[in-house]
UniProtKB/Swiss-Prot annotation:
InterPro entries in the record: Herpes_glycop_M
Coiled-coil positions: none
Virion surface side: 41-88, 155-160, 240-251, 299-312
Record keywords: Disulfide bond, Glycoprotein, Host endosome, Host Golgi apparatus, Host membrane, Host nucleus, Membrane, Transmembrane, Transmembrane helix, Viral envelope protein, Virion
TM region(s), chain numbering: 20-40, 89-109, 134-154, 161-181, 219-239, 252-272, 278-298, 313-333
Protein name as catalogued: Envelope glycoprotein M
Membrane topology (UniProt): Multi-pass membrane protein
Domain of life: Viruses
């Protein structure tokens, strides 16, 4: 296998690189477990967290920080414009769930690499980089650690520090998404890498083709929702620290969210989709974020009705609706381009999709038509039952005077 990627050269660097990958993956898994524990601990006040993390949007702040447009009776105890409690909990625990899936992916990939390379000095670092590059592992560890800080700051209602932590999470998540999808290679080299990997180790190739696409789609869903969290935290910081009025901060947050969402979807279509073609997770994430934005605006409608124009609801619904149409159109475009790519490449993906669709169709038909009626088979009548039959023909005689057996009467029908 003397090719560009798999030269089979034994060296200490290969061995050190493989061990560093295992240590980094183990550290990430430990951080994910700690993040899981701290996230569940934030739900209870008996574990040291002062406030429930899901009620940030229901917290009251002084009116002197709320800007202008409020009546004197409304300036005391004003609630900030933020996600509702279910939406905040969804953002917190959906990220933890995706990181747990990534941990399972790394465990499975590491086991497959070890099974494929009994000699750890032979190509193990190249195979492990196919599962996840070191850049991906480092950024994953940063996001898992910073997420604990983010949840802790939300619980203490230190929204400025929470926003700073989330900016770091957002940047690290962006780097992870790009490095994890590309593996640090150009699209042409990535295709060559995968084709050679299928020959070198089919087990690792199976992991990074199917499982990696699932992991990337799940992360893109969460990352799409992170856009809304980022702009909402930015709006809160503008109101609390810089005296920006609530109408301006709310309008600016929605505009920035739409702009960032369009940039995100265009980056997916122009860059990331060249590596992983079946990629509808970003569009689903933006649709979920739009739903969260709409429900948050409705839950904050009492305050917005007083400080904004009376027609803000139709205008906001029209803007969010138009953006959702754009997102759906880009999702259809991504699906069509993915279908054309797999059809031109004659990959097994379309065959597997057709097989699954046919299986589902057959099961639905059976459920609709009811259980299958089996044919009933009856035992043949024994030969002795014809002995007393007066209409039974006597057996034929051979030329020697012996009776011939009629073999067809002894067979069961």
């Amino acid at each position: 296998m003397g090719n560009y990627y798999y030269g089979g050269q034994e060296s200490r660097l290969e061995r050190i690189s493989w061990r560093m990958w295992m240590v980094e993956a183990a550290c990430y898994i430990v951080l994910v477990l700690l993040t899981l524990v701290s996230s569940f601990a934030s739900l209870s006040s008996t574990t040291g967290f002062p406030c429930f993390v899901g009620t940030v949007g229901e917290s009251s702040f002084g009116g002197d920080l709320m800007g202008h447009g409020m009546t004197p009776a409304r300036r005391d105890g004003v609630k900030i414009f933020f996600m509702s409690s279910p939406s905040t909990l969804f953002v917190v625990f959906s990220a933890v769930f995706v990181w747990l899936v990534v941990a399972v992916y790394l465990l499975l990939g590491g086991v497959r690499v070890k099974m494929c390379n009994f000699d750890s000095s032979y190509g193990a670092s190249e195979l492990s980089s196919a599962v996840a590059t070191m850049t991906s592992l480092v950024t994953l560890s940063i996001t898992a650690w910073a997420w604990q800080v983010f949840v802790l700051m939300l619980s203490y209602r230190q929204l400025t520090l929470a926003a700073v932590a989330f900016v770091g999470i957002f940047i690290a998540g962006l780097v992870f998404m790009l490095s994890f999808a590309s593996g640090g290679k150009s699209p042409e080299n990535y295709a060559t890498f995968n084709s050679q990997l299928k020959t070198v180790c089919k087990d690792v190739h199976a992991v990074i083709t199917a499982f990696k696409a699932v992991v990337l789609n799940l992360f893109c869903v969460v990352f799409g929702v992170w856009h809304l969290m980022l702009v909402m935290l930015g709006a809160v910081i503008m109101v609390l620290n810089f005296g920006v009025s609530i109408p301006k901060a709310t309008t600016g947050a929605l505009v920035v969210f739409i702009v960032l969402g369009l940039v995100y979807l265009m980056m997916i279509e122009l860059v990331v989709s060249r590596y992983v073609h079946v990629l509808l997770g970003p569009h689903l994430g933006m649709i979920i974020a739009l739903g969260i934005a709409g429900t948050s605006a409705l839950s904050y409608a009492e305050t917005l009705d007083e400080i904004m124009y009376a027609s803000w609801k139709p205008v906001a619904a029209g803007i969010l609706g138009a953006f959702s149409v754009i997102v759906l159109a880009l999702a259809v475009l991504r699906a069509v381009r993915s279908y054309k790519f797999h059809k031109a490449a004659q990959s097994k993906f379309l065959q597997q999709v057709a097989s699954v669709a046919q299986t589902v169709k057959n099961r639905a038909r059976r459920e609709r038509n009811g259980p299958r009626v089996h044919k009933r088979y009856y035992d043949a009548v024994p030969v002795d039952a014809y002995e007393d039959d007066p209409y039974r023909q006597s057996p034929r005689r051979s030329r020697h005077g012996e009776a011939e057996d009629v073999i067809y009467e002894n067979m069961k029908y």
